[in-house]
Amino acid sequence: MNTLRYPVLMILSFMLLCGCGSPHGKPGKEAEILAPDQIMDFAILYGENCAGCHGAEGRGGAAIALADPVYLAVADDASIRNATANGVRGTAMPAFAQSAGGMLTDKQIDLITSQIRSRWGRPGFLNSANPPSYSAKSAGNPAQGALAYNTYCESCHGPGGHGGAKGSSIADPAFLALVSDQGLRTIIITGRPELGAPDWRANIPGKPISDQEITDVVAWLASQRAQSAPHANSTSNTTQHQESTNAR
């Protein structure tokens, strides 16, 4: 009997010692749930707030791809952060900052901004390409924009922007009502590679569309918005630099 008693006592003692550090009913660390404003994990923040429009990996969504080195080479952190925090007026891009009625703290927005660039950007990607500026630097001329459209865009999007064999209509008032001037400019610069649309360099091989021509095309498109649309007063294109793209 004694030979069995001692091993049993040792086992019971060991079990008691193991239980001392975890009182019955006390949840372990794995059961702790962070408050929404305490989450500082990019995958969670991006997945819950951005992936629905921009795609699970920063591409493939309805909005412009964020995991696009061309976009990240022309858009600076301040522009990306501003669009994330304050949204884009008149578009589907909401404000996420608590100060603007959203749910995210400044630190969370800073994290999203920095991680988008560190994960998907390529330092120096367009250093030798002399890309157009992210924002317009001058007023656009709709008449000149129509001519530039005919040169660079009509082959895909058709006469007047009403759709062609390769591209959809971009003069549709329903579309123009949902995208800002800056959004149009960004799409022209970066293209939509996932949809087969080239960036500003490749519409005509060896003849990239110029910064001013982009500004003019945006002015021409903006002039076709319905007057009741939120951007109806932006046809001069002078406020592009104050707006963020529909997808940042």
For each feature predicted by the language model, list its residue ranges.
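Electrostatic cytochrome c docking/interface patches
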Residues: G21-I44, G121-A148, N233, Q240-R248
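Bacterial N-terminal signal peptides that target proteins for export
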Residues: M1-M10
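Surface-exposed interaction/gating patches
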Residues: A136-G161, K166, D172
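C-terminal motif of bacterial Sec signal peptides marking the signal peptidase cleavage site
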Residues: L16-G19
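Gly/Gly-Pro-rich "capping" loops immediately C-terminal to redox-active cysteine motifs
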Residues: E32-I39, A43, G55, R59-A85, ...
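The canonical Cys-X-X-Cys-His
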Residues: F42, Y46-A56, I112, I116, ...
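Axial heme c-ligation environment in periplasmic c-type cytochrome domains
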Residues: G61-D68, N86-R119, G124-S135, G164-S169, ...
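Residue-level signal for the nucleotide or nucleotide-sugar donor/cofactor binding architecture
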Residues: D37, A75, L104-K107, G140, ...
